[in-house]
Amino acid sequence: MFNMKKSLLLLFFLGTISLSLCEEERDADEDDGVEMTEEEVKRSLLDTFKNLAVNAAKSAGVSVLNALSCKISRTC
């Protein structure tokens, strides 16, 4: 359980850094100063949440598989 919490925290941290880098890049790309529409804001938020959920699910799956393989091979 502790390993899963650590990996989820790590993924959240990396996702936050990735998100901030993407926002900086997006700000650098905007040269005319046009604001984002509501649709673009919703799309970017949904993509961010989707990516975080997918990464969390992958991490949880890897943690479960590691725990199972450890118990099966009795190397814990």
Swiss-Prot record:
Proregion span(s): 23-41
Main location: secreted
Cellular compartment(s): Secreted
InterPro entries: Antimicrobial_frog_2, Frog_antimicrobial_propeptide
GO cellular component terms given for this protein: extracellular region
UniProtKB keywords: Amphibian defense peptide, Antibiotic, Antimicrobial, Cleavage on pair of basic residues, Disulfide bond, Secreted, Signal
The keyword Signal is assigned to this record: yes
Tissue specificity statement from the Swiss-Prot or TrEMBL entry: Expressed by the skin glands.
SS bond partners: C70-C76
Secretion signal span: 1-22
Claim: Disulfide bond is one of the keywords in the record: yes
Any one of the GO BP annotations: defense response to Gram-negative bacterium
Pfam families: Antimicrobial_2 (PF08023), FSAP_sig_propep (PF03032)
Function: Has antimicrobial activity against Gram-negative bacterium E.coli ATCC 8739 (MIC=50 ug), against Gram positive bacteria S.aureus ATCC 6538 (MIC=12.5 ug), methicillin-resistant S.aureus ATCC 43300 (MIC=100 ug) and B.subtilis ATCC 6633 (MIC=12.5 ug). Has no activity against fungus C.albicans ATCC 90028.
Protein family per UniProt: Belongs to the frog skin active peptide (FSAP) family. Brevinin subfamily.
The protein's name: Brevinin-2ISa
Annotated organism of origin: Odorrana ishikawae (Ishikawa's frog)
